[in-house]
């Protein structure tokens, strides 16, 4: 079976297609259950973030992955990429290191990759090949970030949004900021906002306890999501990143909030995929909406500063891909060697025990040694002898040549006459 990755990301597909293929909340365990029930896929890890959905799998063909994704998300042809074996390994190493992210070198993608691996393991989708690959991925990503500056001054989508808000409002410390959600992206936004100070921080979430935990860490006020409509007008800046399948902020909600604010400008950042804020909010006067795709342009300056470090990280990845592939190939080649040695050891143990019993029963030692040597020869040579006979009948010249390399002719050796019991030695 082959190692594959099939996916789409912010470079290949717009947000409306990425949200179709996003697996968040209850959709993720359902998708993993479906993968587990797909016989053509032996192992799988599903990575789904705001900017990418990728299926890493051990399968007979990429068609099995493509059919599964088509069933889950519809026709995505023209927006997908796929890699096999060494290139799949390289792709995962680059993703986990942050070299394939919207914000070059962003740190949280490694945590998301670890979560995807852990979730796959919990759902019984992880086998030896993918487990080894992901364990090595974590090691490579750590080394690349430690040995280069690719992770220096990390900039995420959330921090890029905060920076844009800081540029739009000369003083965020005189502004009210509303965070919708309580996941990792909102946590990052809250952390960056706390560093820069804001006058008032509101945090709304479906699970109030999660909002309260976040509020306690960053000096905010927690709200249930049901009160979002009532408090939206208080916010100068809104950051939203929930796992909802449908928008949580609608055009009419923002229009009402703007009337409450007497059309004082409001900045809204939709950091979620699927989107949290209805797209036509952007048509409202005094409402300025940014999506994750808009942030692609906002973070270009950060990429330029990290390209030199990224080149160093790429060199590390190139070396580690080669080493990983060589290790896997060597491991695959070791399997028949281990099998051969196990067969030899089992044969030796069995016949040696038989010889000891014969000695204990008083049989002469010379006769026992002769029987032992004869038995070992017959038992060890029976499988290759039978295989070579079958090869001769089928015309398998490759096996014959392999036998000639494995058992070269011994100069001066004369074959003994074939005894009747040597003709077809028993296994």
Curated annotation (Swiss-Prot):
Extra information: During catalysis, the active site Cys acts as a nucleophile attacking the alpha-carbonyl group of tRNA-bound glutamate with the formation of a thioester intermediate between enzyme and glutamate, and the concomitant release of tRNA(Glu). The thioester intermediate is finally reduced by direct hydride transfer from NADPH, to form the product GSA.
Disordered: annotated span: 407-427
CDD domains: NAD_bind_Glutamyl_tRNA_reduct
Protein's pathway: Porphyrin-containing compound metabolism; protoporphyrin-IX biosynthesis; 5-aminolevulinate from L-glutamyl-tRNA(Glu): step 1/2
Record carries keyword Ligase: no
Recorded superkingdom: Bacteria
Family: Belongs to the glutamyl-tRNA reductase family.
Residues bound to substrate: 49-52, 101, 106-108, 112
Gene responsible for this protein: hemA
Site feature: Important for activity: 91
GO MF terms held by the record: glutamyl-tRNA reductase activity; NADP binding
Stored SUPFAM superfamilies: Glutamyl tRNA-reductase catalytic, N-terminal domain (SSF69742), Glutamyl tRNA-reductase dimerization domain (SSF69075), NAD(P)-binding Rossmann-fold domains (SSF51735)
Keywords: NADP, Oxidoreductase, Porphyrin biosynthesis
Domain notes: Possesses an unusual extended V-shaped dimeric structure with each monomer consisting of three distinct domains arranged along a curved 'spinal' alpha-helix. The N-terminal catalytic domain specifically recognizes the glutamate moiety of the substrate. The second domain is the NADPH-binding domain, and the third C-terminal domain is responsible for dimerization.
Name recorded for this polypeptide: Glutamyl-tRNA reductase
Chain sites annotated for binding NADP(+): 181-186
Entries under Pfam families matching the protein: GlutR_dimer (PF00745), GlutR_N (PF05201), Shikimate_DH (PF01488)
EC code: 1.2.1.70
